[in-house]
């Protein structure tokens, strides 16, 4: 079930060793043949994109997409529970599930980090992994739709995950989530307009903005 792990690796912060081992990664995907034909072709399109891209540009794109803001956050429970109390219990439950399989996280990692979850699935029996990837399918599908609207090829990874699941995403949930994002973007644009207007008033104070960022996560080696 290394396909799950590979998708998680491709969804992690891009580094040179990943690019250097892309031929091996592609071979594993083909030999395991877990993905449907169409999803496989698209995933190989993504790996080719990674191979042909400048590493620093890939890293810049990754940070812009996944480390800034909420829309494409790779922590699944943030989309489901936000900062609510239920998120903590969901984390505990997931950690316990990991431990039952002898799967333990590195210090500083959060269990709902999607690449980590995919690595865990690679340790599960095939049928169980396919069932479990369906649990966050609405989150996965929503992020994929948002990335596709941004013309980012990273959407291919999210479509690949969907192709592995038995269940289908709820189109109403996806529509509601994308509509909420558009509303949020409109409010942010209004904030920018107000900030620009204040920049030309008589005030001598300068405002500052803060960006919510998530710590870089280390992907496991393919051979493990």
List where the protein language model places each region.
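Charged, alpha-helix-forming regions
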Residues: 1-113, 119-224
């Amino acid at each position: 079930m290394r396909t799950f792990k590979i998708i998680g690796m491709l969804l992690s912060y891009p580094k040179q060793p990943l690019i250097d081992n892309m031929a091996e990664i592609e071979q594993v995907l083909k030999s395991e043949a877990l993905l449907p034909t169409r999803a496989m072709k698209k995933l190989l399109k993504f790996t080719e994109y990674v191979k042909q891209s400048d590493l620093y540009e890939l890293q810049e794109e990754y940070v812009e997409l996944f480390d800034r803001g909420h829309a494409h956050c790779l922590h699944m429970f943030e989309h489901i529970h936000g900062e609510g109390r239920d998120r903590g219990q969901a984390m505990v439950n997931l950690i316990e599930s990991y431990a039952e399989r002898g799967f333990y996280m590195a210090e500083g990692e959060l269990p709902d980090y999607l690449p980590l979850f995919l690595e865990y699935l690679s340790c599960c029996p095939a049928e169980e992994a396919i069932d479990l990837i369906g649990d966050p399918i609405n989150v996965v599908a929503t992020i994929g739709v948002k990335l596709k609207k941004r013309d980012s090829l990273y959407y291919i990874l999210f479509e690949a995950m969907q192709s592995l699941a038995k269940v289908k995403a709820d189109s109403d949930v996806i529509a509601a989530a994308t509509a909420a994002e558009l509303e949020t973007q409109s409010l942010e644009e209004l904030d920018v307009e107000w900030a620009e207007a204040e920049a030309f008033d008589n005030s001598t104070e300068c405002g500052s903005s803060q960006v919510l960022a998530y710590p870089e996560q280390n992907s496991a080696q393919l051979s493990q």
